[in-house]
């Protein structure tokens, strides 16, 4: 509303100014026509000018009135501009966000609709999680086989990653996975603005968070202190408990570590267990895209359980130190807006079980370090 009002006022001022200049030009041209040929009698530069009474009287007053009129215009228009400019700016930002979201949706769409088929792998335009075909090669035998790779849901990706971290993933992809590099800088087809519009679209499909007093934008229902909606968190815990009750996992912490909800979007095993993403898991927590969590490495990095919980909650930041000898890369997502502190504690307790298993193996002579 403010933006349209200020635009209307600007148009009115412009039209008045143009009309004034047009009137001045027309009057000047018309008055000059009467002087054609008069220079034969008396040159224009020899005509007597206004006398002092006129110059210091009516003409001076007319100029002063014009000056006062312009002063009134400036006095009114400048404060009006200051009042309306924030609204105009907000309207412009909303317009850009709306257009970028629309353009991003066109890129996210299936190939048949002219997009780059992000929706094809990630579970439709709402990106609720899907499956991507991928070929892997056994490094020992050279055998090539086709697998179905779990492509995670993206409707909570802004819960866990910043815009810059998502941009990095889009630009360079995820090595050794179906996620290709899409940005020009990483060898892909998308310009920097294309990537920006994709991120704007992903913002628009985020699940609205609980505890959001002020969302980040009209098309971005997330916020700094937001949390996964209670109904979604309840569904996560129900699935974890079901896995425990069925005997698939021994504890809720183990079930959360290996959670398959939304194609593993909330799973630790996706990055820390090789083969988990295509249902051929190797050593649990043994390392893949993420570091090895077994062999006591997690305890050496985080001697205090509270420090590990804090790290998992906040994720890593590029260049920022963590733990005892860690420096962040930005690849470790923040799970603090997905899981509660109690749920994170259950996951950490499960990770610490790797250390207990190591001690038991050493005690029984299973292997030697």
Residue ranges of model-derived segments:
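N-terminal export/targeting leaders of redox proteins
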Residues: 1-98, 207, 214, 219-230, ...
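Sequence context of c-type cytochrome heme-c attachment sites
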Residues: 49-59, 83-93, 98-113, 120-123, ...
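Short sequence/structural segments immediately N-terminal
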Residues: 59-69, 89-94, 101, 113-117, ...
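Electrostatic cytochrome c docking/interface patches
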Residues: 85-112, 218-264, 362-369
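The canonical Cys-X-X-Cys-His
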Residues: 104, 113-125, 198, 202, ...
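Small disulfide-bonded, cysteine-rich extracellular recognition modules and tandem repeats
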Residues: 121-124, 157, 182, 226, ...
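Inter-heme linker and motif-flanking segments adjacent to c-type heme-binding CXXCH motifs
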Residues: 127-132, 187, 204-214, 247-255, ...
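Extracytoplasmic electron-transfer domains, predominantly the class I c-type cytochrome c fold
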Residues: 135-205, 279-355
